[in-house]
A protein has these predicted regions:
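Active-site beta-loop-alpha junctions enriched in small/polar residues
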Residues: 9-11, 34-36, 66-70, 98-101
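Short, surface-exposed alpha-helical recognition segments that flank or form part
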Residues: 34, 72, 127-130
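Glycine/proline-rich, positively charged
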Residues: 78-132
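N-terminal binding-site loop/beta-alpha segment at the start of enzyme catalytic domains
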Residues: 1-61, 75-79, 91
Length: 132
């Protein structure tokens, strides 16, 4: 695992593929992503371009992503990981982490955030007691 990496949080979608490509071209080999960042498709475009242009091979990169809070149940983990792989355009991740150790009730991938976070005067969390 490379000692220095690029965190991909808050990189705007319209700049993300260029930022990732430029970072790889500069020498970054560790990319830290997450489905919650909302830009994994664009990250994947930057990775693909760097690979297609011969800047790097896939096995020279260390790509990390993270499982979001609403997908902690065992029946959702594989689907969440496969969605991340599809969005990134990759066949594998080097590391897949639990983004935050609080399990929330399931919300479909398209929504990602529980409705009680956004559609209420009193935002809150409905935790899900996920067995370990």
């Amino acid at each position: 695992m490379p000692a220095v990496g690029l965190g991909l949080w808050k990189i705007p979608k319209d700049a993300c593929d260029r930022v990732v490509y430029d970072a790889i071209q500069t020498g970054y080999r560790c990319l830290d992503s997450a489905c919650d960042y909302g830009n994994e498709k664009e990250v994947g475009k930057g990775i693909k371009r760097a690979i297609d242009d011969g800047v790097v091979k896939r096995d020279q990169l260390w790509v990390t992503s993270k499982l979001w809070n609403t997908y902690h149940r065992k029946e959702h983990v594989k689907a969440a990981c496969l969605k991340t792989l599809s969005d990134l355009g990759l066949e594998y991740l080097d590391l897949y982490l639990i983004h935050f150790p609080i399990a929330l009730k399931f919300v479909p991938f398209e929504e990602r955030y529980p409705p009680e976070w956004n559609n209420t005067d009193k935002p809150g969390m409905v935790e899900d007691n996920v067995p370990m």
